[in-house]
């Protein structure tokens, strides 16, 4: 197994759950550092209609999780941009500022992603960033958690 200097992982982390933690733990096994790219609030509102926690709150939590070295909030140039390419670019520029070495970076993907369904794949190739697959199964979803909590609250109030 190749060992990287940096493994990038990304997500909404809204809210963070055990699947995210498994992804970070597996990334940590493959890299000296794990850098997390968080989707911003606008991205989440465009995808889900709302954000459960603010981007600053999510970044604060993620930055304190064991194994996470750096965090970046992705700020796409346009609201229609559904990628984290802006965050990848920020990570590459940070790497070049901090390390006087050839880029040793991978973009890690969870179990719900595979070749062909990751819009950042070509962008990563342009920077010689390797793609790593199966950093955990889709064991949980932030949307599932919010829906479950909402339904439980609704049932309790109507019970």
Locate the predicted segments by residue.
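Nucleotidyltransferase catalytic core that binds NTPs
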Residues: 1-159
């Amino acid at each position: 197994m190749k060992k990287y200097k940096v493994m990038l992982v990304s997500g909404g982390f809204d809210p963070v759950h055990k699947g995210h933690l498994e992804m970070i733990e597996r990334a940590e096994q493959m890299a000296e550092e794990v850098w997390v790219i968080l989707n911003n609030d606008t991205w989440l509102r465009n995808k889900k209609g709302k954000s459960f926690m603010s981007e600053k709150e999510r970044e604060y939590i993620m930055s304190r999780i064991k194994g996470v070295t750096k965090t970046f909030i992705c700020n796409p140039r346009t609201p229609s941009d559904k990628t984290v390419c802006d965050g990848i670019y920020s990570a590459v520029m940070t790497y070049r500022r901090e390390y006087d070495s050839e880029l040793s970076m991978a973009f890690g993907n969870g179990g719900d992603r595979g070749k062909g369904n990751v819009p950042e794949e070509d962008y990563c190739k342009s920077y010689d960033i390797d793609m790593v697959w199966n950093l955990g199964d889709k064991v949980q979803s932030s949307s599932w958690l919010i829906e479950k909590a909402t339904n439980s609250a609704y049932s309790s109030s109507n019970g």
